C-alpha cells in the first residue's frame, strides 16, 4: 500500500496517503526509508529535536541579542487526513516547547505567522470542526495558552499568498509587507480574527485566500519583522517555501531566475531590504539558500 508507514510516513489514523514518488523511494530498499515528517517526529520522540544544532543556534543567538524570533507554520496536520502535506501539528507543539519551556523566552520576543490552509484540509477548517479535526485557530489558541503566549500570534494569512509556488511578485510583496508592518487589516484578539475569517467565508472566500491580518499586542504595539531578527520556517515541503525564504534572505537573483523560468518578470527592488535576518528552515528548500545566503537547515536532505 502506497500510504502510511509503508512509504515512510507516520503510522496515523486516518492513514497519510502517499504518491508515486514516495512509493518509488522504497523500491530496492532493505528497510523502509523514512519521509522527512517521520524523521522530525522521531527526533521529537527521542528528544534529539530539542538538541538540534541549527534550531538551538538561531534561538540562543536571538536570546543573547534580545532580538525577536519570528516563525511561520501552516495550520494543518493534526491527523493523517487534514493536511500534513506541508506541516505537522506535533512539530509545532515541539517547537513551542523548545522556545517557551526550554529557553523560557518572553512572549514579547516571539512572533508567529499562522498560515491558513483550506486546500489540503477543509476549506473552512481554520474555524470549523470537521470529522474530528479542524478548528485549527482554536487549537492554536489552546496550544499557545499552555504557555500564556496567545499574544505571540502576530500575523494570519492565507496560503495562496504566503505559500505561493508560482512566483507571483504581488503575492510575495503582500506577504513581505505584512511581516514588515506595512498597512494591513489590524485586530487585537483571536476572536476578531475569527470574525474576519467568518465574514470572508460568508463572502465565498476560503481559508487559503484569507487576506493578511496583523494582531497588535495589549500595549498597542504592532508586530514587525526587524533588522537582525531570527526567522524560522517550520513547513517541511520545499516548493511553497522558496519564494518566502528567497525574499527574506534577499535572494534577488534566485527569485529572478525562478520567476523568469515561469514566464514572470519581477521588479524586485523591494527585496533590497538589508534585514540581515538569521534564518533557519526545518527542511532544505534550495541549495543556494545555504551556500549563498547563510540560511541554516535543521533537517538537511540525506
Please report, for each region that a protein language model flagged, where it lies by residue.
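Active-site nucleophile/metal-coordination loop of metallo-enzymes that catalyze phosphate/sulfate
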Residues: 1-80, 84-160, 170, 261-302
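Hard-cation-handling environments
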Residues: 145-147, 154-156, 167-302
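N-terminal and secondary-structure boundary signal
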Residues: 163-164
Amino acid at each position: 500500500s502506497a500510504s502510511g508507514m509503508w512509504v515512510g510516513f507516520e503510522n496515523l489514523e486516518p492513514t497519510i496517503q502517499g504518491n508515486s514518488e514516495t512509493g518509488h523511494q522504497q523500491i530496492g530498499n532493505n528497510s523502509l526509508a523514512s519521509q522527512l515528517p517521520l524523521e522530525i517526529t522521531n527526533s521529537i520522540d527521542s528528544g534529539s529535536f530539542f538538541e538540534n544544532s541549527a534550531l538551538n543556534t538561531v534561538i540562543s543567538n536571538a536570546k543573547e541579542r534580545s532580538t525577536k524570533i519570528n516563525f511561520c507554520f501552516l495550520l494543518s496536520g493534526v491527523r493523517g487526513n487534514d493536511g500534513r502535506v506541508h506541516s505537522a501539528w506535533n512539530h509545532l507543539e515541539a517547537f513551542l516547547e523548545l522556545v517557551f519551556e526550554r529557553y523560557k523566552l518572553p512572549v514579547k520576543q516571539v512572533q508567529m505567522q499562522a498560515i491558513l490552509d483550506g486546500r489540503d484540509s477543509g476549506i473552512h477548517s481554520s474555524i470549523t470542526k470537521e470529522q474530528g479535526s479542524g478548528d485549527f485557530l482554536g487549537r492554536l489558541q489552546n496550544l499557545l495558552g499552555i504557555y500564556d503566549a496567545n499574544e505571540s500570534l502576530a500575523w494570519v494569512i492565507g496560503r495562496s499568498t504566503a505559500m505561493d509556488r508560482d512566483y507571483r511578485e504581488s503575492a510575495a510583496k503582500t506577504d513581505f509587507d505584512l511581516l514588515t508592518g506595512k498597512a494591513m487589516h489590524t485586530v487585537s484578539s483571536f476572536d476578531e480574527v475569527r470574525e474576519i475569517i467568518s465574514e470572508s467565508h460568508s463572502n465565498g472566500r476560503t481559508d487559503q485566500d484569507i487576506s493578511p491580518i496583523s494582531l497588535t499586542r495589549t500595549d498597542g504595539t504592532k508586530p514587525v519583522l526587524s533588522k537582525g531578527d531570527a526567522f524560522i520556517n517550520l513547513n517541511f515541503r520545499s516548493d511553497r517555501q522558496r519564494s518566502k525564504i528567497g525574499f527574506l534572505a534577499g535572494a534577488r537573483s534566485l527569485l529572478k531566475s525562478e520567476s523568469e523560468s515561469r514566464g514572470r518578470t519581477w521588479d524586485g527592488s523591494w527585496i533590497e531590504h538589508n534585514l540581515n535576518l538569521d534564518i533557519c528552515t526545518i527542511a532544505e528548500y534550495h541549495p543556494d539558500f545555504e551556500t549563498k545566503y547563510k540560511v541554516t537547515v535543521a533537517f538537511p536532505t540525506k
